[in-house]
A protein has these predicted regions:
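Conserved structural scaffold segments of CAZyme catalytic domains across common CAZy folds
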Residues: 9-214
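Short, small-residue-biased leader/transition segments that mark boundaries at the very start
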Residues: 2-5
Length: 214
């Protein structure tokens, strides 16, 4: 997470402040999000604070037990006296303690939207992104990570989807035998000014896991 603070810093030092668990979801104010028709979900809210920059970062994790889904989003709050320019704020980050995965991305065109491409992960970074102002079938904001032996019926698989129709960014990086996944708004040319007392919320990312195939 990167921001330009009034103290001339390009990073923030967010430290844990509080956490809260509730049985109802605090919905997004400006963007669409996931929901359960029966209202069965739990929410974990983690508040991080940067004392120097007088800003806060609220991380929301919503658990949908019936469908094995966790959603993740972030809300940035400016409680200082000067505006803050956000240049990067991802919706989710997930670290896996393995590196032997196969990345699946999806692309296509009208009437043939979901063509699957696969890449066996090695050391380095793999990016699925859009710069066009839309998501569309040309660069779908949904990715999957499975093991090399994963099939339709066996093996583990992670699925990540960003609920956002604008320019998006999904990156998977492998280093030192570990895998890091991030997903969110496209950071290239992104700059959003958050005024005093204002907030900025990211799109919601949907994460799911299966131990029995795709």
């Amino acid at each position: 997470q990167t921001c330009a603070l009034p103290i001339c810093s390009t990073t923030a030092d967010f430290l844990f402040e509080s956490a809260q668990i509730s049985e109802t979801k605090c919905g997004l104010q400006t963007l669409p999000g996931a929901y359960d028709e029966n209202g069965k979900s739990e929410q974990l809210k983690v508040v991080l604070a940067d004392k120097e920059g007088k800003t806060k970062l609220e991380l929301y994790y919503d658990v949908y037990e019936d469908c094995d889904v966790i959603t993740r989003r972030a809300v940035f709050k400016n409680e200082g006296e000067q505006p803050v320019k956000l240049r990067r704020l991802m919706s989710m980050q997930l670290d896996l303690h393995r590196a032997d995965y196969v990345l699946s991305t999806f692309h296509g065109a009208w009437t043939r939207e979901m063509n699957r491409s696969e890449a066996v992960l090695e050391t380095g970074k793999y990016v699925n992104e859009s710069f066009t102002g839309t998501s569309s079938s040309r660069a779908n904001p949904f990715i999957m990570l499975g093991r090399k032996e994963t099939t339709e019926d066996t093996g583990e698989c992670f699925g990540i989807n960003l609920i956002y129709s604008g320019s998006h960014y999904e990156a998977v990086e492998v280093q030192a035998g570990r895998t890091r996944i991030v997903s969110g708004i496209q950071p290239k040319n992104f700059c959003f000014t958050v005024g005093t007392g204002e907030v900025f919320e990211t799109p919601e990312a949907v994460l799911t896991y299966a131990a029995s195939g795709y």
